[in-house]
């Protein structure tokens, strides 16, 4: 009986151990950085080769947007990002109106493998130039 229990325990530990190790790992999950509008503006002034991504709807973009911003509505990121943003290591600065949709867009970009995503909230707090 004791030999049988040892065998059962050994088999259980052999099967359970890999699951225990995998379950505790975060898998090296990536994330995006949340920065202020002033920090985003400083990056725009000092960096080159970045993308400004407006995550709002077309009518909102038409009413006014940050100069040079491209429009990809937050709910279209999964469908359009790979075509519009081919370099997954490029600096991508994401905004929307208030910050809610830009967070969703930034999360989706990270899920798609983008590695240099910065979310800076909404245009309602943007204190710099806007074009129509």
Predicted segments — roles?
Residues 52-54:
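Structural scaffold elements adjacent to functional motifs in cytosolic proteins
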Residues 13-14:
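Hydrophobic helical h-region of N-terminal Sec-dependent signal peptides
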């Amino acid at each position: 009986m004791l030999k049988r229990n040892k065998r059962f325990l050994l088999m259980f530990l052999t099967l359970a151990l890999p699951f225990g190790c995998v379950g505790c790992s975060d898998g090296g999950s990536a994330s995006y950085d949340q920065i202020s509008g002033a920090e985003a503006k400083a990056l725009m002034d000092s960096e080159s080769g970045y993308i400004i991504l407006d995550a709002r709807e077309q009518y909102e973009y038409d009413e006014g947007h940050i100069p040079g911003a491209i429009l990809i509505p937050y709910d279209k990121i999964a469908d359009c990002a790979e075509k519009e943003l081919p370099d997954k290591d490029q600096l991508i600065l994401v905004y929307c109106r208030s910050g809610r949709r830009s967070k969703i867009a930034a999360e989706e970009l990270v899920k798609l493998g983008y590695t240099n995503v910065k979310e800076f909230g909404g245009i309602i707090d943007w204190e710099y130039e806007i074009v129509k």
